[in-house]
């Protein structure tokens, strides 16, 4: 399995994501939206950065359980309840991201939503990995 990151010059240099990811070989793993909850399915914090970190940790746990590594994540979809807060805290969020994902930047989208199924959740992350 290999990834080729597609970033056309005409689109400018992306910051923290890739415009496209071309894969060859491997199996697809579709990862359900992950929120910042623990084993008892309780949200661990009301802080956005802490929630982002735990949701990403939970997502990576699914990839690992399937026999993969974070570098095999091809696409991330982030749902947030407050885009402005996310933008204000991007530096902190980026630090947590790099601590878990290194400099691996899959195709990514961020969507602001009115709410998530878990009332206290501020972020939910789903993904596709190629194993």
Question: How would you label these PLM feature ranges?
Answer:
Residues 1-57, 61-74, 80-131:
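N-terminal presequence-like segments and the immediate start of the first folded domain
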């Amino acid at each position: 399995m290999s990834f080729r990151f597609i970033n056309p010059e005409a689109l400018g240099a992306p910051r923290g994501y890739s415009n496209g990811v071309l894969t060859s070989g491997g199996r697809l793993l579709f990862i359900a939206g992950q929120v910042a909850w623990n084993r008892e399915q309780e949200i661990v914090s009301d802080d956005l950065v802490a929630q982002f970190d735990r949701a990403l940790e939970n997502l990576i746990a699914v990839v690992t359980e399937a026999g993969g590594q974070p570098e095999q994540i091809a696409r991330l979809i982030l749902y947030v309840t407050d885009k402005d807060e996310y933008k204000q805290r991007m530096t902190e969020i980026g630090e947590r991201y790099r601590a878990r994902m290194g400099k691996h930047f899959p195709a990514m989208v961020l969507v602001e939503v009115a709410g998530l199924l878990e009332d206290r959740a501020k972020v939910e992350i789903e993904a596709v990995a190629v194993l």
